[in-house]
Amino acid sequence: MSTGLTANNGIEEFGTIAVAMVTPFDANGALDIKAGQKLAAHLVSNGIDSLVLAGTTGESPTTSLEEKIDLLKAVKAEVGDSAKLIAGAGTNNTAASVEMARASAEAGADALLVVTPYYSKPSQEGIYQHFRTVSEATDLPICAYDIPPRSVVPIAPDTLCRLAALPMIKAVKDAKGDITAATTLIAETGLAWYSGDDPLNLPWLSVGATGFISVIGHLAPQLLREMYTNFNQGNLEKAREINAQLAPLVAAQARLGGVSLAKAGLRLQGIEVGDPRLPIVAPSESEIEDLRRDMNKTGVL
């Protein structure tokens, strides 16, 4: 638990450092339950206190509800109460999101991550009604995922304030990156705030975020924990040093995308989770060599 400089709200529901975990597949492209359990145990034993399953990095668009729930149950059996399990329950279909939320709750999820409906481009009232409907489907706390590059439509500040009044909306995963606007919203809404973009993890802590939901955490879980701990304890110079150390991984993620980065990087570390499903593709040999270089620079290979 945070006791220093970082914000405390949301820790009991969502933890501090989460990894948006990949969904492992075997050589035939089928769900690999054992690999998922192994990866979850590895991340938790290296400082991660929360796992997001069936999110964007978990290839939610190309996995079935049955696969999502099977992985959630298996990871729950593996890690127990040693980490919070946040289940992705966001689609651009409100009824489908409700179904996913209820199934995840029954399977043992601790919380839900619900993204702004993508592709449909709903109005702000539509966004509010979507989140309200999903939030009333279970008694699990919800982290609202604001990511305009994927959803096109952002969650407007007024809408966030309305969402904050709903009993089960407890947090925001911010991949919008407008720290200036969010600084006011953090204070006004009382919601727990989580960085949803690895380049901004440290800056977000400085304005009141509780933690971050990371992709590069697959490859550098201990470094992320060390950066968080040093910031929390007031060792800002060390926190900045670690943040700079992570920069090559951030650059690699920008080049490859989160799924391809995480799966290829884990393979280089000896943790096999298979290749992505189409339309995501694995990196080329030259891209893997560039990734190897970046991982060596970061000290995680």
Curated annotation (Swiss-Prot):
Cellular compartments annotated: Cytoplasm
- Write out the catalysed reaction: L-aspartate 4-semialdehyde + pyruvate = (2S,4S)-4-hydroxy-2,3,4,5-tetrahydrodipicolinate + H2O + H(+)
Give the first-level EC class, as a single word: lyase
Gene name per UniProt: dapA
Record family assignment: Belongs to the DapA family.
Function statement: Catalyzes the condensation of (S)-aspartate-beta-semialdehyde [(S)-ASA] and pyruvate to 4-hydroxy-tetrahydrodipicolinate (HTPA).
State which pathway it belongs to: Amino-acid biosynthesis; L-lysine biosynthesis via DAP pathway; (S)-tetrahydrodipicolinate from L-aspartate: step 3/4
Q: What is this protein called?
A: 4-hydroxy-tetrahydrodipicolinate synthase
| EC number of this enzyme | 4.3.3.7
Q: What is its main location?
A: cytoplasm
Q: What domain of life? A: Bacteria
A Pfam family recorded for this sequence:
DHDPS
Residues flagged as site, Part of a proton relay during catalysis: 56, 119
Output the InterPro entries linked to this UniProt entry.
Aldolase_TIM, DapA, DapA-like, Schiff_base-form_aldolases_AS, Schiff_base-form_aldolases_CS
User: Which UniProt keywords are present, listed alphabetically?
Assistant: Amino-acid biosynthesis, Cytoplasm, Diaminopimelate biosynthesis, Lyase, Lysine biosynthesis, Schiff base
Check the record and name the NCBIfam families matching this protein. Answer: dapA
Extract the GO molecular function terms from the UniProt entry: 4-hydroxy-tetrahydrodipicolinate synthase activity
User: Its Gene Ontology biological processes?
Assistant: diaminopimelate biosynthetic process; lysine biosynthetic process via diaminopimelate
* Subunit structure and binding partners: Homotetramer; dimer of dimers.
Q: Which GO terms describe its cellular component?
A: cytosol
